[in-house]
């Protein structure tokens, strides 16, 4: 009888521990975020000719125009108990992650591209001088929100991004073109992980960058300036 009572007590303690663990939430989530252009399909009208290859495209770190207190925050996890936990990127800033993605895409397209330079506030009078470069690309993050609502039996992941890209003539200090794109992803999955959130962010970022460069007017402006 005492043995049964002992087993029952151990069972109750175990269930209590598991219950506490399931209710516990981390103070913050961090995800890897970036764009790998390896498998990107570059439109033929964007690819450089021999004249374009004689110059370098400068890429500036993006600005962040979101109305938020902390520009490192890129989303939230809504736990089962309703608590909202912040999501931050690992080892990078959102503004740098976007600029690096743009750089990777241009390299995939075949252009000579500089490393990501200092942040540009997108005004012609403050345009940084780019060495050996006729054009520079910068831009703004207008929306970037990764959300995961944890529930049973599935977790709902959604990602929203809105980016604006600026193409500038660094010789004449003139903005030549700007374009805005939006990208969204959604996923229902039985499991929850930071890796899965990061993967959804990667997809949305890649989709936004590819949409930007699919615009023929932007491609035409790049070719025009580099062809001078």
What does each model-found stretch correspond to?
Residues 113-119, 151, 220-224:
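Surface-exposed patches in mature extracellular/periplasmic domains of secreted proteins
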Residues 24-39, 118-174:
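Surface-exposed short loop/turn segments
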Residues 2-10:
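Bacterial N-terminal signal peptides that target proteins for export
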Residues 73, 79-91, 168-214:
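Short secondary-structure boundary motifs at beta->alpha junctions and helix caps
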Residues 61-64, 140-146, 182-184:
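Generic short beta-strand segments
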Residues 10-21:
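Bacterial N-terminal signal peptides
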Residues 23-105, 212, 216-228:
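A structural "domain/chain start" motif
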Residues 103-125:
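Short beta-strand->alpha-helix linker/helix-N-cap micro-motif
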């Amino acid at each position: 009888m005492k043995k049964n009572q002992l087993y029952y007590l151990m069972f109750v303690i175990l269930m209590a521990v598991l219950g506490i663990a399931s209710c516990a939430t981390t103070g913050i989530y961090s995800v890897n975020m970036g764009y790998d252009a390896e498998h990107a399909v570059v439109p033929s009208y964007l690819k450089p000719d021999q004249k374009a290859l004689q110059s370098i495209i400068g890429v500036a770190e993006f600005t962040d125009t979101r109305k938020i207190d902390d520009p490192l925050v890129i989303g939230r996890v809504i736990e089962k108990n309703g608590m909202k936990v912040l999501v931050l990127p690992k080892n990078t800033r959102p503004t740098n992650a976007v600029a690096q993605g743009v750089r990777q895409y241009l390299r995939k397209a075949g252009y000579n591209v500089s490393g990501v330079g200092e942040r540009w506030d997108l005004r012609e009078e403050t345009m940084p001088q780019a060495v050996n470069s006729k054009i520079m690309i910068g831009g703004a993050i207008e929306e970037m929100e990764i959300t995961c609502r944890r529930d049973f039996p599935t977790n709902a992941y959604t990602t929203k991004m809105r980016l604006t890209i600026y193409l500038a003539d660094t010789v004449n200090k003139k903005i030549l073109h700007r374009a805005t794109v939006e990208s969204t992803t959604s996923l229902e999955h039985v499991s929850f992980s930071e890796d899965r959130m990061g993967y959804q962010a990667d997809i949305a970022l890649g989709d936004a960058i590819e949409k930007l460069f699919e615009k023929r007017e932007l491609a035409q402006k790049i070719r025009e300036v580099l062809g001078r």
